[in-house]
């Protein structure tokens, strides 16, 4: 395969999205639309990738650089919206001195497969001409440019409005994806004339110009694969296709999805074999789940790591958490950023953690908040325990040693330490460090008044009779 550069058109406003946000920044499975064609170009080994920006140029550039910080990006600006040919021409300066193949992609076409683009580049090499293109066959080609052939050879693209009745019967359409020789591309773009009253320049003219200089290569792709996004209905439709692809890939790799139609799994998620994922689970980008895990119904994992053999019970939420092997989490647990759990940890219903490191075999099974905490191994934290970590200005650390037992309804007022093997009685407010092997109790002594209820009722009856 020849040396490759790529131009990705990201300048459009996307008026039909009815949004203040640039169209290519609208998310599809957790990533902006434009991330998908950009990723494809990089997968193919493009040595220069030129996103052409226009509408909200700074926002688009910032987003793309954030997604691909180490990529060979060279941004180009289309100052006015004057058609696709003008947009590509905006990239000429960014590719000055380059003489290889230029792959032209659209920032709002997220479903193109790598294999299709590899076939396009191979078709370009095989044809030996100036240009190769992707075509697609549509049941209803109304509105699309038709691929006109002569003896099987591509000769030009005719827009629907300009087609003769015979040409309108053609169902092979232009998908708008091209591989073009750079030297030909820049010269041909300079020759293209505006096609309408708005002074717009269209790339489709390139095909006829290339056909006059040699054979035009072509490869056919499924219509779903080449479909763009113009409004939010189409955005949702493309997302469904992409989600199905992702879910099927996981299942073929040994992952069980109880209800593939409701499992929301973004790109950039890794799941090990023999893991079972329940209905309506969300696995966001950056999440890694080991083998033999169970992710229960309605659970949400954002950029979290779950080691082998762990069970996440239904409706638990993990955000940038690190979970060790054989943990049992939930139901209804929330692990916030900075949570790190060792092996065999149990966190039960309505337990919330934040910046908490919890050692091997420790348990907090009910109604507990553990924030800014370091908890040793083999600890038991009773129901209703709270680390009081915030004084109104600063956060403070709570430390529990190994083998600590914390009774129910305990408040640990940070900064505070409870030493190895210590016990804290139920209902205690711990404000001072507890030495190893100690018992800390701060409850008010119980007072029992026998016969008090009868005395109270008699007094109330007398008052009513008054």
Curated annotation (Swiss-Prot):
UDP-N-acetyl-alpha-D-glucosamine binds at residues 23, 78, 83-84, 106-108, 145, 159, 174, 230, 336, 354, 369, 380. Binds 1 Mg(2+) ion per subunit. One of its GO terms (cellular component) is cytoplasm. The keyword Cell wall biogenesis/degradation applies. It holds the Pfam family NTP_transferase. InterPro entries: Bifunctional_GlmU, GlmU-like, GlmU_C_LbH, Hexapep, Hexapep_transf_CS, NTP_transferase_dom, Nucleotide-diphossugar_trans, Trimer_LpxA-like_sf. Residues 254-466 are annotated as: N-acetyltransferase. It catalyses: alpha-D-glucosamine 1-phosphate + acetyl-CoA = N-acetyl-alpha-D-glucosamine 1-phosphate + CoA + H(+); N-acetyl-alpha-D-glucosamine 1-phosphate + UTP + H(+) = UDP-N-acetyl-alpha-D-glucosamine + diphosphate. The active site is at residue 366. Its EC number is 2.7.7.23, 2.3.1.157. In the N-terminal section; belongs to the N-acetylglucosamine-1-phosphate uridyltransferase family. In the C-terminal section; belongs to the transferase hexapeptide repeat family. Its main location: cytoplasm. Pathway: Nucleotide-sugar biosynthesis; UDP-N-acetyl-alpha-D-glucosamine biosynthesis; N-acetyl-alpha-D-glucosamine 1-phosphate from alpha-D-glucosamine 6-phosphate (route II): step 2/2; Nucleotide-sugar biosynthesis; UDP-N-acetyl-alpha-D-glucosamine biosynthesis; UDP-N-acetyl-alpha-D-glucosamine from N-acetyl-alpha-D-glucosamine 1-phosphate: step 1/1; Bacterial outer membrane biogenesis; LPS lipid A biosynthesis. Catalyzes the last two sequential reactions in the de novo biosynthetic pathway for UDP-N-acetylglucosamine (UDP-GlcNAc). The C-terminal domain catalyzes the transfer of acetyl group from acetyl coenzyme A to glucosamine-1-phosphate (GlcN-1-P) to produce N-acetylglucosamine-1-phosphate (GlcNAc-1-P), which is converted into UDP-GlcNAc by the transfer of uridine 5-monophosphate (from uridine 5-triphosphate), a reaction catalyzed by the N-terminal domain. This is Bifunctional protein GlmU. One of its GO terms (biological process) is lipid A biosynthetic process.
């Amino acid at each position: 395969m020849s040396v490759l550069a790529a131009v990705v058109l990201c300048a459009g406003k996307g008026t039909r999205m009815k949004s203040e946000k640039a169209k290519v920044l609208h998310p599809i499975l957790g990533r902006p639309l434009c991330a998908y064609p950009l990723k494809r170009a990089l997968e193919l080994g493009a040595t220069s990738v030129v996103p052409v920006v226009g509408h909200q140029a700074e926002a688009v550039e910032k987003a793309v650089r954030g997604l691909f910080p180490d990529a060979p990006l060279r941004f180009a600006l289309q100052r006015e919206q004057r058609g696709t040919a003008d947009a590509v021409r905006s990239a000429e300066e960014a590719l000055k001195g380059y003489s290889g193949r230029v792959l032209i992609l659209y920032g709002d076409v997220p479903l193109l497969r790598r294999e299709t683009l590899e076939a396009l580049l191979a078709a370009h090499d095989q044809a030996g001409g100036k240009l190769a293109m992707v075509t697609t066959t549509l049941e209803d080609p109304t509105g699309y440019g038709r691929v006109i052939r002569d003896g099987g050879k591509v000769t030009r693209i005719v827009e629907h409005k300009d087609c003769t009745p015979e040409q309108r019967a053609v169902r092979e359409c232009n998908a708008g994806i091209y591989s073009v020789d750079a030297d030909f591309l820049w010269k041909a773009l300079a020759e293209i004339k505006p096609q309408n009253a708005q002074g717009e320049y269209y790339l489709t003219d390139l095909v006829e110009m290339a056909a006059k200089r040699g054979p035009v290569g072509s490869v056919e792709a499924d219509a779903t694969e080449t479909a763009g996004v113009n409004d939010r209905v189409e955005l949702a439709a493309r997302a469904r296709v992409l989600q199905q692809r992702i879910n099927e890939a996981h299942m073929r790799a040994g992952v069980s999805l109880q209800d593939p139609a409701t499992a929301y799994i973004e790109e950039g998620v890794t799941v090990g074999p023999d893991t079972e994922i329940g209905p309506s689970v969300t696995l966001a980008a950056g999440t890694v789940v080991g083998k033999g895990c169970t992710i229960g119904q309605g659970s949400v994992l954002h950029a979290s790591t779950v080691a082998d053999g762990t069970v996440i019970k239904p409706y638990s939420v993990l955000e940038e958490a690190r979970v060790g092997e054989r943990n049992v989490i939930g139901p209804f647990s929330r692990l916030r950023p900075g949570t790190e759990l060792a092996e065999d940890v149990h966190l039960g219903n309505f337990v919330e953690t934040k910046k908490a490191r919890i050692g091997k075999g420790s348990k907090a099974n009910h109604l507990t908040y553990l924030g800014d905490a370091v908890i040793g191994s083999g600890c038991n934290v009773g129901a209703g325990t709270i680390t009081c970590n915030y004084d109104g200005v600063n956060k403070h650390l709570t430390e529990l040693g190994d083998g600590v037992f914390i009774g129910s309804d305990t408040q640990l007022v940070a900064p505070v330490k409870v030493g190895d093997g210590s016990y804290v009685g139920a209902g205690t407010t711990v404000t001072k460090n507890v030495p190893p092997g100690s018992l800390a109790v701060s409850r008010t002594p119980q007072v029992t008044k026998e016969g008090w209820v009868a005395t109270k009722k008699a007094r109330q009856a007398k008052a009513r009779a008054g």
